[in-house]
Structure formats: C-alpha cells, structure tokens
Amino acid sequence: RFKNELLLRYIKYKIPRKMTIAKILKAMDLEEMQPFLDEAELTADTLLTKENYEDIVKVFTIHWDIVTEHYRRSNNAAKAYYKAAVGNSKSAVIVDIGWAASGFSALRYLIEDEWKLDCKVRGLVAGSTYLHDMDIIEPQMTNDIITSYMFSQRINREIRRDHDVKRMYGAFTEIMLSAPAPSFIGFDFDDDGRIKYEFDYPEAEGYSMINEIQDGIHDFVNDYTKHFAKYPCMMNICGSDAYAVCRQVISCPEYFSNLFADYPVNRAVGSASFETGSLGKLIENEFVK
C-alpha cells in the first residue's frame, strides 16, 4: 500500500543529492536488488538522476516481492512489539511532529488492517503540510482520524501557507524537537528470538546543543506553569499561539544559524546514504530567501 511512499522518500527525494545506486541500496538495506538493476544497465556506480528514476522504479516494481520478503522479518518483529504494547487496549494515540503523517498512516495500516490487533489508532501531529502526500493525510483529517494542533488545510490556513518546507521551516522546527539519540530505524530479532531495536548512526556532535534546547524548554514550561498556576485557562494554549515560537525561529535564520551553525544535519533518510553536514552550511546552500 505504501510502495510509492517508500520509493519517494528513499529514492526520488534523493535525486538532488547526486548519490549512486549503491548508496541508495545501502540506505534501504536492499543490496540484493543490485543484480536486477544491473540487468537494466543501472550499475552500482550509476548516479541517481531524474532521467533514470522511472527506470529504477520499474525494476523495483517488477521485483517488489524481493522488497517485501526482505522486510518480512522486521515486520514480524514490529508486530510482536506493538502487539505487546497495545495489549488489550481498544484505542491508542500516536503523536508525531508531522508533516504528512506518513509514518502514522503506515503504522495505523499495520495495526488495524494487516496485523488486525483490534485497536483503533488516532494520530496527533503538530502541523500538517506536504508536497506529495495529500491523498494519505487529507482523508484521515476529514474523518478526524488525524488531528493537527498548529495548522493544516482545515485550521490556521494562513500559517500553513507561510510554513514553507522549501525554505527549511520544517527542518528548523524538527531541530527544536530533536532528541539526543540516534534515529530509530526498525525492529529485528536477536539470536535468542527476542525483539531488538535498530538505530541509525549517532550524530553525537549535536547532542549537547539538543540538551541545551530541551533545558530551555523545561525552564520555560516550569516558569509558565508557576506564574499561571492560579489561572488554569492559561494552560489551554491554542495552536496559533504555540506556533509563535516556531515563527520566531524561522523568521530569523541568521540568528538560528549563529547559535547552531555546527549542528549536524542529514538531509537524506539513512545516515549511511549521505554525508552529514552542518546546519550553517545547509542554510548557506539551501535556504531560499
């Protein structure tokens, strides 16, 4: 069901990165696809381009059974994990920053449709904006399966229009909400059959900066709740007010860059697939004024 999403995120979105097919397959952990790509004259050292993208997709589509079989073990481990986590619950909420809710949508499909865990899943996202995923998120928002806090096509549309992903606004917001830990990749089983968690390469150079950001968030929350303890209505913060913090950051990219110029940033899915750069260099190269 989410074949197109996988191909978009792991292949199409990487066209500007000037990556080889070998690096793309490594990021996807699908090196066994290389012989089939070789048959189509798409060798390991071939650079991904907009001209050969459809040819690559065609090979993946023809041999999609290889892809699904490769990820079957991870799927089974994920099922075991979420079955234990859900337990006897009849409903659950998944919280994510956004922006297209593709991760939530895939997990909801697995829990409700493929694994049939008898649990209805709802999603909460900070904001909803997207380039290619309207058919995934919009029907779910219309049916109240997904609720967006700060902005979406349904609420605070003026904020959604201003939140330009091409100007790195999404990246700035995600940095503010990052964790001092490697990105989670997926599930697997160890040699004893127990569930284990797999993580991407740690970008440890940024952990101290993340901790500073989170300390600042905690300080603000503590001060806010202290000063308004007698006014519970002040705890009901609307999405547009919450976005004021994001707006302050994205309206001053130079200030943000001065504070976090050395923050490590990987613009591609899978650290093994692309050399990590710095936020300062990224703003210099990609920010559209």
Give the ranges of each region predicted by the language model.
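Long, contiguous domain-sized segments
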Residues: 3-289
